């Protein structure tokens, strides 16, 4: 990860994350680890199993994320990366899309990839 | 910081940050350091002097932030803290408030306080 352009890495991550979310939500398990944290609309969840259980139990089946902005910054000397996303979430059968903001803290793995250490999601109500 | 409740610390930080922004913007200098990064509506800025120059040159004088949500998570073993904020920004003379999302990565100082290492700000356009 450290050898790649951070903006390119974060954009690739964001595309991978939301396309997995929209097509095969259980596949998100590969992006979290036991120490991973998710705060979803204020609810705190920890660990890959609990996080995937939460994401797969959300009260909608079909959805489509549309990304508006992606910002990234290195998070410090441990070579993590912060990714900040804004966009819209379209649920099947709903007329209006929901606006959301989400941040990820990506940490490198020994294999040269990365995983989601921190994840905070909020809907932006009008 | 490590001895305090993270939710209490993040809430206190958020109140301090936005009240300083709304009443004495140049006073935000005390919260950043040379390594600090700000991404403001996609524009990347580094260092306390450049960050404060940006914040004090925004094209409005009077403003008032209203906070809707504050979420926080520890960012890793270095005992930093991620703070994720959503809210509204009311500018003087404008009828409608602007929705925004912002994230801060707070890092501890040797004096037991903390400073803003990462700061990403986005308006959430309707």
Swiss-Prot record, chains A, B:
Domain NTF2: 9-123
Keywords assigned: Acetylation, Cytoplasm, Nucleus, Protein transport, Transport
Domain of life: Eukaryota
Assigned GO CC terms: cytoplasm; nuclear envelope; nucleus
Tissue localization of expression: Expressed in roots, stems, leaves and flowers, and, at low levels, in siliques.
Subcellular location: Cytoplasm; Nucleus; Nucleus envelope
BP GO annotations: protein import into nucleus
Sites of N-acetylserine modification: 2
Function recorded in the entry: Facilitates protein transport into the nucleus. Interacts with various nucleoporins and with Ran-GDP. Could be part of a multicomponent system of cytosolic factors that assemble at the pore complex during nuclear import.
Subunit structure: Interacts with RAN1.
Protein name as annotated: Nuclear transport factor 2B
Gene of this entry: NTF2B
